[in-house]
Structure formats: structure tokens, C-alpha cells
């Protein structure tokens, strides 16, 4: 792990004023800066614009192109309002560096690693540059292992890979935020791990709502901030494209420190990976590059790869990434989502139909997929159980039109039995969440994989055909369902 001892690129006081340039051109968030001969900054170096006189401007930019004639082209990480030609620019001599370590937990940062939550400065001297190479092959942990989440529907039907990448698909109001918070809570309790949330180009209101909900559910501990389980990094919709393009790397850098130095399992959330591509497209156009297919940047695959390849398992720890994927106009062949899919190990699809039925988490058991669901990885027992659950639910789905028109009585005895078991399975896939206790009043449940498999095997075998289906709704393991059935009878 390469640690850079300098402070954040925006803090001019810590930078030796040895390499000065001047702004010669400003086009929106893009600046052209002239430097003395032989003093050209490197690509990705952070430049800081100095205000004139006593003005505190401190706009940080990142070098993107060397133009010749001792000029560089840089992209600003904040608004360029008030900047003028002739202003002094300092080359910090290093990429943007952000604070890392335990003191980042419970705090909100911007792309430069500056806290934006009005809780004062971050208590750390350890910073790390946001541009780093992916781990070498020899450092990687190539063993395929399941990342147990304690959420039945995920662990059984679309299991996550330790150090893998998961795409999270779902519209507004189907429970994305609650699922994300439950995963943050469970990784802290079951794996002793931490989480980093990168808000990339989404609404400021949503970022604020997430922060308040995390405080309410205890994921962020207001009384004792260092006891929190998550660090938040935001680069929202209103920020320049440079900030939105780099905020994902800031979040990833914080996650890498927990993996490489603290040797922890880390969950990295990116919401939304499409906005990362969109920001890169804007920057590419501003830099004058020829657009590629559908107007995207010609470097789309390279940019996506440089982010995704750093998200992996090493011999020290793992970064498991869950990425919300916006699909523009529901076109899965659009270059942005299509490039993302190439990197994903699993997809978790949230269904509005299940949410309308009150089944939470509203994960669609038939649409969600995982490359890990293979007998040689999860074992024959897990694989067979998952396949039988999917077959039962698929048959129920096929019969729903007949049931709607003719009713249950017109079905064969075998199909009626399938429908009854499918309805029990559908309800047993629901689960009370720890982070939702404050809303539901039901205590949260973490269900181990072995318990999950046992429960579904009992339903499929027909041993529980005599129990009412409401006994399976919002319970943890199968023993709770049988106990609930006894209570319903009395």
C-alpha cells in the first residue's frame, strides 16, 4: 500500500510554492495553464488555483493533457466561478490525495477528501493518492468463495462472490436504500468489516436522506462517530463533471486502505455507476476528444476497467462492490450499461410487483443471477435447492394467468400443490431487517446459509404443506415459521 504523507491536494499551506503556472484560458470547468520551461506537471497531478490578494479561491484541478508550448489542460473539481486569466496556479507535485483509515468512518467527504458534514477536520495524517494501479496478479486471491450476507434470497438464489462486483437494478421506492443499509449492517456484525458509500452524480436530496436514515438506524453512530460502520463520499449531480468522474476513485481509495492495511473485508457501494460513465463522457467532450458510439468517450472501456480492476480480493482482504446501475431508456445494449455488465459477477434485481405485495426485500428471485451458482462452487445441495426453488416459482408464474381467469379450482392437483408451495416460498424469501426495526417493530434476523438451505428443502419436500402461508411471512429461519404457525392456530 503506497501512502502519500502530503495533505489533500486542495490545502495549499502544505504545498511548497516551487512550481508556479498561470491560467491562460478558461472554458467552463476546463483550464489551460502555462508553466515555465522544464517545469511541466505530470498527468493526474493536482493543481491549485490561488486567489488574487486576500481572496481564498483554492480551486483544485487535475492535469488531463499536456498540450505543448509549456501548457497543460486541467479539469476543475469545483466551480470555476470567479477565476480569471493570469491567476497563479500551484503544481502540488502529486495526484489528489484523500484521508484514509478508521477516522473516515461516520463522516461525509467530497471528491478531494474534505469533510462536508460540519463536524470539524478529520483526525488523521494518513492520506493516499486516488490514482493507483490494480493489485498485481501475485497479490490476488483467486479462490472462489461465497460472501454470506445473511439475507436469504441473496444467499440462496444469487449469491455474492467475495471480492466480486454486483449490479443492483431497481426503480425508485422499491427498497434499494434499505437493502444497502442492511448489507452495511450485516458485514460489520458478521464479518467485522466496514463499508464505503460513493454517491456518484446522484441527487443531493437522496444523499442527505441516506445519511439521515443511516443515523436513525444506527449504521452511523451519532454519539460515538468512530464506532460507525460506513464512510460516505459524495460527488452529486450539481457538481462539475471532473468531481463526478473522480469521486468513485476517492471512495475506492478509502476502501483499499481498509483492505490492504487493516486487512478487512470491505463493502464498496457505488450509486450510480452510469453517472461515472456520463461524467467521463462530458470531460472527454470538453477535452476535445472525438466521441465514439452513441456519443460516449472513446476511452470508455479503459476508464471502466481502471476503476473495476482495483475492486478485487487480495491475500490481505477483499473489496466486494455493489453498484447501482441506471439503464438509459431501458436499453441494455447501450454502451454504458453493456460495458458495466462485462465486469459483474452477480445481479440483484428489485421488483416493484413484489414490493407492492409487501414482500421485502423485494428481490426478484427469477431475474436475479449469479455466476457463483454452480455445483462446483456452492456444492450440489445448495445448487439443487436453488434450482428447485426457481422451477417452482417459474411454474407459479406460468399458472398465474389461468388462476386469474378460471381460479385455483380449475388447476390439476399437482399444480395446486405447486402453487401452495410457491406462495410459501415467496413469503419465506421475505425477511425482517435490522435497519428496518425502527419502522416495523419486528427484530431483524440474520440467517446463515445452511439454515436458509434447510428451510427451503423442508418447504419443497412437502413436510410443511399443512402450515398456513402467512406463517412464512417476515420470519428468519424455518423454525420461526413453524413456531409462528403454532401461534396462529392457538
Swiss-Prot record:
Gene3D superfamilies: 2.40.10.170, Bovine Mitochondrial F1-atpase, Atp Synthase Beta Chain, Chain D, domain 3, P-loop containing nucleotide triphosphate hydrolases. It is an enzyme of class 7 (translocase). It is a peripheral membrane protein. It catalyses: ATP + H2O + 4 H(+)(in) = ADP + phosphate + 5 H(+)(out). One of its GO terms (biological process) is proton motive force-driven mitochondrial ATP synthesis. F-type ATPases have 2 components, CF(1) - the catalytic core - and CF(0) - the membrane proton channel. CF(1) has five subunits: alpha(3), beta(3), gamma(1), delta(1), epsilon(1). CF(0) has four main subunits: a(1), b(1), b'(1) and c(9-12). This is ATP synthase subunit beta, chloroplastic. It comes from Ipomoea setosa (Brazilian morning glory).
Amino acid at each position: 500500500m503506497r501512502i502519500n504523507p502530503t495533505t489533500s491536494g486542495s490545502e495549499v499551506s502544505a504545498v511548497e510554492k516551487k512550481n508556479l503556472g498561470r491560467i491562460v484560458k478558461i472554458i467552463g470547468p476546463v483550464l489551460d495553464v502555462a508553466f515555465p520551461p522544464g517545469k511541466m506537471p505530470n498527468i493526474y497531478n493536482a493543481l491549485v488555483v490561488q486567489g488574487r490578494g486576500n481572496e481564498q479561491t483554492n480551486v483544485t484541478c487535475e492535469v488531463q493533457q499536456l498540450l505543448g508550448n509549456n501548457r497543460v489542460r486541467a479539469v476543475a473539481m469545483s466551480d470555476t466561478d470567479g477565476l480569471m486569466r493570469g491567476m497563479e496556479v500551484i503544481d502540488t507535485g502529486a495526484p489528489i490525495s484523500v484521508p484514509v483509515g478508521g477516522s473516515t468512518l461516520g463522516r461525509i467527504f467530497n471528491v478531494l477528501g474534505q469533510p462536508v458534514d460540519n463536524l470539524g477536520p478529520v483526525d488523521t495524517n494518513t492520506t493516499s493518492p486516488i490514482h493507483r494501479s490494480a493489485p498485481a496478479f501475485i497479490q490476488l486471491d483467486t479462490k472462489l468463495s461465497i460472501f454470506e450476507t445473511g439475507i436469504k434470497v441473496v444467499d440462496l438464489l444469487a449469491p455474492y462472490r467475495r471480492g466480486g462486483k454486483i449490479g443492483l437494478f431497481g426503480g425508485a421506492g422499491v427498497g434499494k436504500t434499505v437493502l444497502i443499509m442492511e448489507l452495511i449492517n450485516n458485514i460489520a456484525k458478521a464479518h467485522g468489516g466496514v463499508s464505503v458509500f460513493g454517491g456518484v452524480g446522484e441527487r443531493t436530496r437522496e444523499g442527505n436522506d441516506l445519511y439521515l436514515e443511516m443515523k436513525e438506524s444506527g449504521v452511523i453512530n451519532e454519539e460515538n462517530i468512530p464506532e460507525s460502520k460506513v464512510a460516505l463520499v459524495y460527488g452529486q449531480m450539481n457538481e462539475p463533471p471532473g468531481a463526478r468522474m473522480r469521486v468513485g476513485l476517492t471512495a475506492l481509495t478509502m476502501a483499499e486502505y481498509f483492505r490492504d492495511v487493516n486487512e478487512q473485508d470491505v463493502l464498496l457501494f457505488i450509486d450510480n455507476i452510469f453517472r461515472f460513465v456520463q461524467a467521463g463522457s462530458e470531460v472527454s467532450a470538453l477535452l476535445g476528444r472525438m466521441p465514439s458510439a452513441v456519443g460516449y468517450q472513446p476511452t470508455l472501456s479503459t476508464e471502466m476497467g481502471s476503476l473495476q480492476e482495483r475492486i478485487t480480493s487480495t491475500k490481505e482482504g477483499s473489496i466486494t462492490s455493489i453498484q447501482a446501475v441506471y439503464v438509459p431508456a431501458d436499453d441494455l445494449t447501450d454502451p454504458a450499461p453493456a460495458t458495466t455488465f462485462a465486469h459483474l459477477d452477480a445481479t440483484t434485481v428489485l421488483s416493484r410487483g413484489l414490493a407492492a405485495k409487501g414482500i421485502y426485500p423485494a428481490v426478484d428471485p427469477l431475474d436475479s443471477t449469479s455466476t457463483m451458482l454452480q455445483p462446483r462452487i456452492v456444492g450440489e445441495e445448495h445448487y439443487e435447492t436453488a434450482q428447485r426453488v426457481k422451477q417452482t416459482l417459474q411454474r407459479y408464474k406460468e399458472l398465474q394467468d389461468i388462476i386469474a381467469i378460471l381460479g385455483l379450482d380449475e388447476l390439476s392437483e399437482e399444480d395446486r400443490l405447486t402453487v401452495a408451495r410457491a406462495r410459501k416460498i415467496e413469503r419465506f424469501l421475505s425477511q425482517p431487517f435490522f435497519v428496518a426495526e425502527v419502522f416495523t417493530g419486528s427484530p431483524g434476523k440474520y440467517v446463515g446459509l445452511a439454515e436458509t438451505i434447510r428451510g427451503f428443502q423442508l418447504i419443497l419436500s412437502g413436510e410443511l404443506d399443512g402450515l398456513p402461508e402467512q406463517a412464512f411471512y417476515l420470519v428468519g429461519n424455518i423454525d420461526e415459521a413453524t413456531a409462528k404457525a403454532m401461534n396462529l392456530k392457538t
